[in-house]
Structure formats: C-alpha cells, structure tokens
Amino acid sequence: MKISVKLIKELRIKTGSGYLECKRALQKSNGNIINAINYLRIVGTDIAQRKVLRKTKFGRIFSYCSKNLGVLLELTSETDFVSKNEEFKNFGEKIVNFSGNNKIFDLTEINEIFNSKKINFISRVRENIEINKIKYITGNIIESYQHLGKIGVIISGKMLSPNTHLNTTKCFKNIAMHVAAAAPLYLSELDIPNNVLQKETDIQKSIAKKTGKSSKILQAIIKGRLKKFISEITLINQNFIINPKITIHDYLKENQVWINNFIRLQVGENIDNLNT
C-alpha cells in the first residue's frame, strides 16, 4: 500500500526513527501506526543487541551538583559525532540528574534502570552507547568544573575562617580547574595505598642501584625521587597550575580553606581515581 508522507512524519515524531525506517515499518504494518511502532521496537532491539559489543571510545562527562552532593557520569559512544548529538546530551543529563536526585550511585543499578531507554537510543543512532562510569562525592561545599564535556571535576571542602562566599567559590573553582588539568590521583600522601608506595620504592631502588653509589647516597636518591613521585600524584603537594611558584597546600592556606575530597572523570580514561 502507498504510505503518505504525513503518516511517515507522524511515526518519526513518535519514535525518533529515520524516514526510510518509518516508511518500511508502515508498509509492513499496512499503515497501522501502533503496529508500526511495535515493529520498530522489535527491529530496533535486534539492531541494538548486535551493537552492544562494539567499543565506545568517545563520549561526554555529565555532572550533578546540589548543596552537599556531587555526581559525575561518563556516557560513551562509538563516534564523536553521536556524542555531540543533542539527544545524547539530554540522555546523559537525564541519567546523572536521576542518580543525584534519587541518590543511586551503583553503576549496575543505573544501567538496569535505563536499559530499555538505552536500547531504544542505540536502535535510533545505530551505534553502541554505554553508561560507563559513575562517581559521587559529599560535603558541605561542592564546586564543579567541566572542560569541553571531556573532563569533569567535583570537589568538596570547608572554610577554615569566615571567608566571603565569592572568594570561597572562586578559590574552589580554581582548584577544580587545576584538578582537571593536573589529574592528581590522591588528595594527600596519607591517601596513597601502601602497595603503590612500595612498588614505586622498589622501582627507584632498582634504578638507584645501577648508579654504583654508596648506600648512604642511594638512600638520599631514593628518598628524593619518592618525594617527587608523591608531589606529582597528590593534589595538595602539586604545584598550582595558575601560580606554579606555590603548591595547592600553600593556596589553600592562603585562602583559609581546605579540600576534603575530589572526584575526576575523563572520557576514555581507564585509571580510576581511588579517592572515591
């Protein structure tokens, strides 16, 4: 039977599917909108199931912030083109807001809740979409920073003296920007797991022994290199990117504030910040 453009348009509005897909569905359903929708759902689910194993290396980071809660979510796709799609952005915002509003942070649970919507989305864009990572943070002061949708940072902290709100906000925003750029793994030396420090110590011992120096000098070399290692991976010991002459610790002290915790997500990054 001949399918009118008006009917195809109506089905497209209802399902978000392409023109030719809607036309084919209506032809298969003899022009019945309800049957056409069901047909698209069946075909779309089949297409989606074939695509879910494809790798997703592009995507965006989404954030949710309330007075004392922050959530970061990584939603990934196969291509950069889809990750810039408005529907992709809306889907990511919907998920992260749901997580924050309902205080659900378990990735498996979030995937189960949004699975049917994700499958429908995959069938429309014809490529795999993954709800890849989710992190959350709590605290009295929450500040966030997003860099081009590819890196997201949220920090929690506290005032050590009655600073003005404007100064505090600016201070924490600067630190969030620093975390985005410098990618610290831990807040302080106390947060570094013993096995990480031990592994680095063993590596530096092996390197130092090759110098043929005396035991006393070797100990000094190892100690110096470990100190450098710690300063590179801990937030408060890093040189402040905005003013490299001081450390983050110096900046915090100067502004009479402190960082309790932070989370950072970057699209496609496999190294987890163990601060969560």
Swiss-Prot record:
Keywords: Cytoplasm, Elongation factor, Protein biosynthesis. It comes from Buchnera aphidicola subsp. Cinara cedri (strain Cc). GO terms for molecular function: translation elongation factor activity. Belongs to the EF-Ts family. PROSITE patterns: EF_TS_2 (PS01127). The keyword Cytoplasm applies. Signal peptide: none annotated. Residues 79-82 are annotated as: Involved in Mg(2+) ion dislocation from EF-Tu. Pfam families: EF_TS. This is Elongation factor Ts. GO terms for cellular component: cytoplasm. SUPFAM superfamilies: Elongation factor Ts (EF-Ts), dimerisation domain, UBA-like. Associates with the EF-Tu.GDP complex and induces the exchange of GDP to GTP. It remains bound to the aminoacyl-tRNA.EF-Tu.GTP complex up to the GTP hydrolysis stage on the ribosome. It is found in: Cytoplasm. Gene3D superfamilies: 1.10.286.20, DNA helicase RuvA subunit, C-terminal domain, Elongation factor Ts, dimerisation domain.
